[in-house]
A protein has these predicted regions:
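Conserved, mostly hydrophobic/aromatic
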Residues: 85
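Conserved beta-strand-loop surface patch within small alpha/beta domains used
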Residues: 1-82, 90-136
Length: 136
């Protein structure tokens, strides 16, 4: 009873799929808010370990500054297609801060950092673990 074998945990990584159009829109949005942070809501679908981003929403009443961006979640209309957020970091780091993790919304958080290009986008889960991104 006390000496049971521990079950092995098969860690399956979630994968994020972004279209070229979504990626270009995010890059343009981040550049337009520089040197402040910009934030968008991701719309999409989750199928098993695959998260496909199908749209972007500019959050109502969002706030932007050089070290923060956010929005009041209670002002959002109810929509089951919201799967997370993407926001920009005007610095050269696309790692989530403690503040980013504490204000996590949805299944995934994407961060794009300066100079705002495709390879500057990173995805994270609620615990700050990296997720794979596919741009197609």
């Amino acid at each position: 009873l006390f000496f049971r074998k521990k079950k092995e945990i098969n860690e399956v990584r979630r994968r994020i799929i972004l279209t070229k159009q979504i990626t270009d829109s995010v890059i343009t949005y981040a550049k337009s808010w520089h040197p402040n942070e910009g934030i968008l809501i991701l719309q999409g679908k989750k199928e098993k370990n695959l998260i496909k981003v199908t749209g972007l929403i500019i959050p109502p009443f969002s706030t932007h500054g050089p070290y923060y961006s956010g929005f009041p979640v209670y002002e959002l209309p109810f929509d089951l297609s919201y799967i997370g957020t993407i926001h920009s970091h005007p610095s050269r780091s696309n790692k989530p801060s403690l503040e980013d993790l504490n204000h996590f919304f949805g299944l995934v958080s994407l961060i794009i950092c300066y100079p705002y290009d495709t390879e500057d986008i990173a995805a994270f889960d609620r615990n700050g673990n990296n997720m794979d991104i596919e741009i197609g």
